[in-house]
């Protein structure tokens, strides 16, 4: 049954700061995540997206049954490149009626020559992997957020059912990844049952060495064996640190000691304001290398002598306990970090540890700093006297804002406040539109209207930081109410004039409030 439906793979690439040129939305009484309002000449149009398409997969992850904002989030976090598997509207509706397994659609498609450089999600960005990569997963809620599968005609075990925003996805695991190692042990020739057992025995944390679908195909065609020494460590949440120090009048300002609990040489008793403290050395750091040479197998006196031979400056490769535990679990020496970073022996280049992907951030711009400055979505149902607020604008300036919110009126009950700046009306950005157009859009809406607004302080903050204000930053609205429930007859719009501004008594709304509409 599934073979009669032909989904399309569309690869979209945009410039930094620009959009993909389409809206992703859900509509009342309509199934699926819909593609709408495709801009002419946009990346969306060039990639072949069509109005009414339903998005089945994003970067290989099946999303048809996921919450809409999670789907929007996946697109946003893909950076400047995203791959969508879509099905045209008519086919989608027929498939739903025939109860076709949408998850199976497109899975047998082999990538074309043009697909060789398809981008893959990596911690919210886009990156093409041509080398194996190491991923570290820690269970959340008793789950890693993936399943394992075997593929007919191919050896090995592969990753599937990657849960959107789950542990595996955040760790950098991709759909159809070939699993090479589990906790440093090669599993290329292991059975499905053996691999499952190894993962279970690992407990609440596990490391995988993986190759993506394209890389795996390349290795298979060229009969190249995957080499663990070529692995990328970039996805690990903790990394070794290269620390450079210049000796002060009282030396470096730390003690080097052997630990009965941990094999190797441990940093202890760092003096305040010493070269060691200023360089970022921490108590209980384990010394892996001195001036580019591994000291993991050396005794205490030998390591001390190597530091002394460095003269008035030294470069240490160190790991904290968490980093050491991750590398040990994966069966890698932290010294491998030198090769992976292409640092020459003896390098004193300071390499900052990468920051793990944010867990609950809805778009790349919404950081913790923005937390107190988020916009809000307000859904207003027209009352007997309209919406209960006035819309104002300063002459000669773009943008409209809220004034005179009537206590107990629809606007007040929806959370609208004086000085709130209107960002969107029913999903359409109105920031650069004239006052008249904003008024007209509200008036032509119907019985309810959904506004994305931003308080003056928050608006000024976003403008200063040049952060675009989008609906995914706001808390989601509850399910739509019945627009006819409790409806009162509306009054005619009442316009007023003030010396410095125009304002209009707001009325009306539109059935578009029965959708979530996000510009991509």
Curated annotation (Swiss-Prot):
GO terms for molecular function: protein-membrane adaptor activity; signaling receptor binding. Residues 352-373, 472-520 are annotated as: Disordered. Its main location: membrane. GO terms for biological process: positive regulation of protein targeting to membrane; protein localization to plasma membrane; regulation of monoatomic anion transport. Signal peptide: none annotated. It is found in: Membrane; Cell membrane. Pfam families: PDZ. InterPro entries: NHER, PDZ, PDZ_sf. A scaffold protein that connects plasma membrane proteins and regulatory components, regulating their surface expression in epithelial cells apical domains. May be involved in the coordination of a diverse range of regulatory processes for ion transport and second messenger cascades. In complex with NHERF1, may cluster proteins that are functionally dependent in a mutual fashion and modulate the trafficking and the activity of the associated membrane proteins. May play a role in the cellular mechanisms associated with multidrug resistance through its interaction with ABCC2 and PDZK1IP1. The PDZ 2 and 3 domains seem to be involved in the interaction with SLC26A3. Interaction with the C-terminus of CFTR could be mediated through independent binding of PDZ 1, 3 and 4 domains. This is Na(+)/H(+) exchange regulatory cofactor NHE-RF3. It comes from Bos taurus.
